[in-house]
Each structure stands twice: as C-alpha cells, then as structure tokens.
Amino acid sequence: MLFAAVCNFVKDGLSTWTPVILKEQFGLGDSASMILTLILPVFGLFGSMLALAVNRKIRDYRLMAGVFYVGLSFCLGGLLLSFRGAGVVLTLALLGVISCLAYAVNNVVTSMMPLELRDRVNSGFLAGLMNSATYIGSTASAYGLGRIADGAGWNAVILVMLGASVLSALAGIACAGLRRSR
C-alpha cells in the first residue's frame, strides 16, 4: 500500500501544484502554467507502456516499483536543483519524466501486482484496495503539500516527495531482495 499511496502523493501532488510552482518559481503566467500542466498526464500513457516493457524484463512487482521509484527519486532531486536557476525547460522535462514514472508505478500496483498475486488473493479485491491507497496519497498531497509550501516553500515540498520516493525505492528493492533470499 506504501507504493500506491506514495505514487499518487507525488503524481497528483505535482499535477495539483505545478501551476503554482511554475508561476512562483519561474514567473510564468496563469494561462501558460495551466496549459503546461495539462500536458503532464499525456506522459502517463508513456508510463503505462514503460511499465509493460519493464515487466518483460523484471517480473517481480516489488523490484519493478523500486526501480521506478529510484528513477523518481533522481528526477525529484533534479527538480530540486532546477529550482536554483536551471530554467523552466529543464523543469518541465523533469516534470514529464516524473509523471511518466509515477504512472508506471501506478500501473504496477493497481494492475500488475494484483494479477501476479491472483493465486493467493482475490485480484479484484486487491486492485480495489491498492486503488483506494492511491486516493489516500492524492488527498494527502492536495492538502499536506499546500500546507508545507505555505510554511516552508516549494523546496520543502519537493524534499518531502523525495523522501517518500526514496523510502519507497528502498522498501521495494529490500522486499524483492528478501523474497529472492528465501
């Protein structure tokens, strides 16, 4: 459930707050910020295709989610650095890759994992449970990240997302390693 909640915490947190970030960090107007934000979900399609392609090579959903979270962590770190003068183009590129990777994780936890575990648990129930965890992450990001931004700024918001992503990466890779050692 950690993977699902953190996935939408990052994905929907950025979708919700990107217009404000672009306006405050880079001085973009409201219209430009909104239009650029509307493009982010398009990267989700590529995230779904990426998850399918990676699933051919990495069959363990824990490891696959962990690998995607490693990528998310690097991109979030890059996003943090881009706020220090790298420019809006690099920031938008990183936001696109982050969106792609977050959608890939979402596919892993709401579709691939339940199918992989179908012999042990009702896959429909598990998919619904994971989907509900994604909504918990979305809700936490909408309110929580706004509060953090108001109190400590956008760098703190990205650091919180980065911490959650690193924790998820470590959990996924560790769980995959424990499973293999059995």
What are these regions (language model features)?
Residues M1-A51, N106, T110, S141:
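Extracytoplasmic gate region of multi-pass secondary transporters
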Residues Y61-M112:
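C-terminal transmembrane helical hairpin of 12-TM major facilitator-type secondary transporters
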Residues G47-D60, A149:
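Helix-to-loop junctions at the C-terminal end of transmembrane segments
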Residues L117-A152:
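A late C-terminal transmembrane helix in Major Facilitator Superfamily
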Residues L145-V166:
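A membrane-interface helix-boundary motif in multi-pass transporters
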Residues I21-F26, K57, M112-R120, G151:
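Helix-to-coil boundary motifs at intracellular loop junctions of multi-pass secondary transporters
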